[in-house]
Amino acid sequence: MMDQARSAFSSLFGGEPLSYTRFSLARQVDGDNSHVEMKLAADEEENVDSNTRSNHIGVAKPKRLNGYVCYGIIAVITFFLIGFMIGYLAYCKRVESKTDCKTLVPTEPSETEETETFEAENFPQTPRLFWADLKILLSKGLDTTDFTRTIKMLNEDYAPREAGSQKDESLGFFIENQFREFKLSKVWHDEHFVKIQVKGSNAENSVTLVNTDSNSLVYPVESPEGYVAYSKATTVTGKLIFANFGTKKDFEDLKMPVNGSLVIVRAGKITFAEKVANAQSLDAIGVLIYMDRANFPIINADVPVFGHAHLGTGDPYTPGFPSFNHTQFPPSQSSGLPNIPVQTISRAGAEKLFGNMEQDCPLTWRTDFPCKLVSSPSKNVKLTVNNVLKEIKILNIFGVIKGFEEPDRYVIVGAQRDAWGPGAAKSSVGTSLLLNLAQILSDMVIKGQFKPSRSIVFASWSAGDFGAIGATEWLEGYLSSLHLKAFTYINLDKAVLGTSNFKVSASPLLYSLIEKMMQDVKNPVTGQSLYRDSNWINKVEKLSFDDAAFPFLAYSGIPAVSFCFCEDTDYPYLGTTMDTYDVLSKRVPQLNRMARAAAEVAGHLVIKLTIDFELNLNYEMYNDKILSFVREMNQFRVDIREMGLSLQWLYSARGDFFRATSRLTSDYRNVETRDKFVMREINDRIMKVEYHFLSPYVSPRESPFRHIFWGSGSHTLSALVEHLKLRQKNSSAFNQTLLKNQLALATWTIQGAANALSGDIWDIDNEF
């Protein structure tokens, strides 16, 4: 047996003797290392004989072929195993921390594993759906929704629902319960204690004609049922002057001083508050507002009208800070409150006043009845306003669908809940859209069809009729953090007022997304795409003070959008007692289909903003806005040079912003969309672009709407341009020191936005 083993072992190495080389610790004298040949003891005798024969016979060289083959096989196997292990370990490192690397040796599945495998095969997980599939699912959900049922219910069960009333609160709790039934991730509400102005119960508001010489009563014109909130409560008397719509241009075209006089203007074009502010700036003592037949074709001539005169949003008696019950600020009031009385009158009352006026109006001002400019010399108008302040509690209702990956980033969808009067078009449509969208999107999430990366917040606001009070107070309460989390606001108020046109007002950051949406959504009446004009961006109107989206954009720096289906003329019943479901359904016979289209518009925006890894906000659109401003400023180069100033730094700021957007676009293209950390860092830079256009050089309390493009005040770019125009028109009213400040601060605000967009301070490369 030993012989066989030795033979096999020896043959494995080609029959060669086994040897090794030993290196001694001490060198030999001749410098050679000792060489020892190791032999098997049993072979010694054979080797002796072999050595004896070697003296006579030449030694044959042993064959080494078998040894080479063996070494090669061992090397190949070794390299294969090493490569396999390296690949396996590299794979294990890529697996998420929660996943353990499985053993390479297959084992028999346990009984539990077999059961789980069986269940997985029979009940596969719903795959994550993307835009094309979600668009179809949303459409199917909208097709089975009856929007008019909700609108009608709100009109029958919760009207009228003035802010703070029992019906307003009851509707709020109804919406809160609905959100819970829809199984939203979380539902809650917050309370605010605000001051609104209502008609006095002890004395009526009135408009009368009196004799010029004795102020004796000629005859009463009207004791209106409607009123204008936040008017000054007082009595004034003076001649009456017609100023068309009360715009700044109308007062310029009037070419007649209005100081010491009352002004009568038509409703429309601009808000009540702006009309009053324009008249007050020219020292008028009071304002009357009416709806003419040409723009508001209401058959009933004595329909009362409601509005507000606060040139701002939120509670005007807590400007810049939230009106929570526990806040203890000293008494203060907004600078946007008027110091003159304001009152709405019916068309019938306006006709009586025009019957006692003279001098023809400009041709472009002609209305449906004889248009006269000024009251007759023998008669004056007396206006009495007895409105009183009232403190009320309002509720804002919220529900959220939490995002799967970035729940701390959210889009907000909101609608006004209250209304002076029935409010079918003003608030019922928006509330219906809000409720049904929440239900449809929540169902899609529950079924595993829709997995939004970011959260969706649904909000029902109160006191919207008094200047977006509910929305603004909420923004003021969370001013320090909202711009870091909320990246878009979608307003649903007054979304359906007609069928012919689709109008949109929005931040430039949303233009590209809106255009894609318009290409996908069709007008249900015409069957045509909402995208009908490639030049639509140039026709976008600024958000007005009366729009709840305005404070999100101009106060908080959150991109916002407001849209509506409408006609060429204004919807005539807003703010009146005729804003009912019956009137709306007659005015818009395809009401349910139009409401479905409005919900589809909002739904498309919500889904696109929450499913993609990249944030769908086109920051490059502001390059065009800044360039337009620079071009406008270039028209005043001579004036600026005469003042010893230069536009060089403005050019540099504009260039830095352009380079910052280009660099960010390059970063976007180079990063892998699956690299969530880098994508989030880039998205955070994008979502703050709007915020960085809020001027840091003015106080949110003194000038709450700090946005240099869309805000209000001397810090805005439009105010800077208007001030330069004043130098050419009326140099005595021009303030050079103010202009220097305006130019410097506007330049630095743009530069600050460029720096913020660039990212870290070591990435900033500008000429300042």
Curated annotation (Swiss-Prot):
Modified residues (Phosphotyrosine): Y20
Lipidation residue positions, type S-palmitoyl cysteine: C70
Membrane topology: Single-pass type II membrane protein
Mediates interaction with SH3BP4: annotated span: 1-70
Regions that span the bilayer: 69-89
Extracellular side: 90-768
Motif (Stop-transfer sequence): 61-64
Gene3D superfamilies: 3.50.30.30, Transferrin receptor-like, dimerisation domain, Zn peptidases
Domain named PA: residues: 231-321
GO process terms (BP): intracellular iron ion homeostasis; iron ion transport; positive regulation of B cell proliferation; positive regulation of isotype switching; positive regulation of T cell proliferation; receptor internalization; transferrin transport
Complexes and interactors: Homodimer; disulfide-linked. Binds one transferrin or HFE molecule per subunit. Interacts with SH3BP4. Interacts with SH3BP3. Interacts with STEAP3; facilitates TFRC endocytosis in erythroid precursor cells.
Family note: Belongs to the peptidase M28 family. M28B subfamily.
Protein name: Transferrin receptor protein 1
Lineage: Eukaryota, Metazoa, Chordata, Craniata, Vertebrata
